[in-house]
């Protein structure tokens, strides 16, 4: 069975909102772009490495729209752009009707948990999710996330959307910790499940 891997940029206080710029100002969030002072080539290399382990993306509508607007216009021959365009993408949305923004995209409108379980049962590499806080929370509540790859940035934002859902205890096991020179640390966790449940 394939794994669902959540890949997030996160502050020390667990905030994942708007790491790249002003892509998400919900709740009056004004601190977008907080990853850039810490970004470096080694993080780029890690991102390429992690994408090579994924052959399907699962995204919420807002993340899908932001990514599509960034990756689809990239010129043919750009390695990252070509890979992201070719990768099958599933976008969870009850309102999206047009997927022309980003090729190879399919909308999941209903029965989300059942559809995700069916995707996991298909052969292939990992299914990757980034951003998409509402979707990540729903999958966590149904114990469908198999791994969290958290790039923890050395700052406290004080508020914003968080990686983990409120009110739910989760026991995780650290399987990798990798520091980067800028102070960012990759923390790779897997849920601790009953023996034989994985």
Regions found by a protein language model. Give the residues of each.
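Enzymes that bind and transform nitrogen-containing heteroaromatic metabolites
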Residues: 1-198
